[in-house]
């Protein structure tokens, strides 16, 4: 699985003309792939959309011939984007919760 993910990502990055080191860890939770290099903003994309799309494609390639029970979760990250984004969303949720408590007005979902 690691080799399949590596080869696929290497080809995609080459087509995008992006120089990056690909580090892959096989954990109990699945494959954790970290891309390291300059100008990773192009890999992240707007609000992580490019990163999410690449993660989805890698997951499809890795799990192509697997059954439902053998599915391997794939997480693709760069520059610690995923944990930074999670922190940002938690801060936003807390701010909105404080506003609701303060104003006692219902908040519309986003």
Question: Model-flagged regions — what are they?
Answer:
Residues 1-110:
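RNA-contacting regions in translation and RNA-metabolism proteins
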